[in-house]
Amino acid sequence: MKPAIVILCLFVASLYAADSDVPNDILEEQLYNSVVVADYDSAVEKSKHLYEEKKSEVITNVVNKLIRNNKMNCMEYAYQLWLQGSKDIVRDCFPVEFRLIFAENAIKLMYKRDGLALTLSNDVQGDDGRPAYGDGKDKTSPRVSWKLIALWENNKVYFKILNTERNQYLVLGVGTNWNGDHMAFGVNSVDSFRAQWYLQPAKYDNDVLFYIYNREYSKALTLSRTVEPSGHRMAWGYNGRVIGSPEHYAWGIKAF
């Protein structure tokens, strides 16, 4: 072997050896920063290397920090890992909710504040569709089954939210109430940003929750404080601040 090639091989080997000697807190900082600045290709490559080096705890710690800090980028990071052949990293290093989301499993959307499952009405309200609400009783029937379908655009991941029983998509209506809130419906058509959503993870006690924002209006999906005679609470895109209060405005994602 030529001396130049030997030197090059030794140099490359030294780089890997040096990387393996870097303290975990430095590796965590490097990975966290890659995610926060939306350099997802770099974050994915770092994660693959860490996983191969049996340092999955570094990834887990970064994911937990992203969630604690309410970083939306956590969703894009997880999706790019999933998309780029590292589903095992998502399964092993992220909370189970991320796997449920990106595998398009049937899920329940449970409003943390009231413990109600999101569903669609039997009745159609004009051209708007079926009103969406938190069911006062039903937490188990196919009517509360949903799945999230990911879309990648402009370095962000959005979701269509499909009710699997009705085969209809969750949207916000165009009109607003006196408070500026948009009512939520289930519809057949998905040709509008009103039918696309983005998620922001949050931590409350031991629960991983998600704020669910509408792409068109940037308003969070919430349930009304008014209780219907049936015990239901209507779903709205809320015209107000929600960040910092996941116990009031965020949703749990549970396997159906």
UniProtKB/Swiss-Prot annotation:
Disulfide bonds: none annotated. Residues 1-17 form the signal peptide. This is Low molecular mass lipoprotein 3. It is found in: Secreted. Detected in larval hemolymph (at protein level). Transmembrane segments: none annotated. Its main location: secreted. The keyword Zinc does not apply. Keywords: Lipoprotein, Secreted, Signal. The gene is LP3. It comes from Bombyx mori. It comes from the Eukaryota. This lipoprotein belongs to the group of structurally related '30 kDa proteins' that comprise major protein components of the fifth (and last) instar larvae and of pupae. Belongs to the 30 kDa lipoprotein family. One of its GO terms (cellular component) is extracellular region.
